[in-house]
């Protein structure tokens, strides 16, 4: 089985085929095979695409791999999907081998949900887990009241005039993080353009007026934020999309306060829908961030699934 050719551009029809492929795999597996960033990249030319098509006259996509380039110390990252009816034909193995060959074995692979086929492919190719991202969930019922510390202002996103402070806090809070750190204005603009974006769901915690002189703009300084999201394709599901606290403001309980304010908002916004079932909120946290995991457990969250990043332990030796 060959993996096809690398492409830096996908046609509109190819993008549609990949989205359809992801939808089918999600319905069968119960977990999306790729993250939302991969779907954003389909129309861009910032990543490499590997497309495997069947031999029917329409040549529909039965396999897809997205390879994002390395950034500084962060390895190149691949995410892939194979059509459920085309599995056990070596397609995933061929795509993984192609990605390893392209990067000299120095990339990682996300396995969303860490499903059995992904574990088997990783084992067969000598890939080992290097990172785990835990998805945690809880019901939006019986939420504790948020406690807002004295001298703290809470408001929602007012527009692009908030972007500079948002970027400052985000990049300070996630300086270590491969995906969330190093954001630019373009990253914010992309997410504002998403259909789910709602400025009323982005909460800002600012220092009281006595701290205004600490901000370059002369406005109250941003201490933290909670960006919530409602999943339009999964009624009743909300998300703690990004929760960031300025490292200089940690230890004041801002994370808990912002979390509860956001969850209360999700409850109200999802409560307007006739769902027929209980509303739920999800979030992602690195498995080795023990303090954060324990904090969320204390707020009633429990593990729903785990995404695993795999890589070669010794790329040079493995590819020699």
Swiss-Prot record:
CDD domains: NAT_SF (cd04301)
Residue positions binding 1D-myo-inositol 2-(L-cysteinylamino)-2-deoxy-alpha-D-glucopyranoside: 36, 179, 229, 239, 284
SUPFAM superfamilies: Acyl-CoA N-acyltransferases (Nat)
Pfam families, sorted: Acetyltransf_1
Protein's UniProt keywords contain Lipoprotein: no
GO BP term (any one): mycothiol biosynthetic process
Residues annotated as binding acetyl-CoA 1: 80-82, 88-93
EC number: 2.3.1.189
Membrane-crossing segments per the record: none
One term of GO molecular function: protein-N-terminal-alanine acetyltransferase activity
UniProtKB keywords: Acyltransferase, Repeat, Transferase
Annotated binding of acetyl-CoA 2, by residue: 243-245, 250-256, 289-294
Catalyzed reactions per annotation: 1D-myo-inositol 2-(L-cysteinylamino)-2-deoxy-alpha-D-glucopyranoside + acetyl-CoA = mycothiol + CoA + H(+)
Gene3D superfamilies documented for this protein: 3.40.630.30
Domain N-acetyltransferase: 8-141, 152-320
Keyword field contains Repeat: yes
Main function: Catalyzes the transfer of acetyl from acetyl-CoA to desacetylmycothiol (Cys-GlcN-Ins) to form mycothiol.
Family classification: Belongs to the acetyltransferase family. MshD subfamily.
Matches recorded under PANTHER family: L-AMINO ACID N-ACETYLTRANSFERASE, MYCOTHIOL ACETYLTRANSFERASE
Subunit description: Monomer.
Protein name: Mycothiol acetyltransferase
Organism annotation: Mycobacterium ulcerans (strain Agy99)
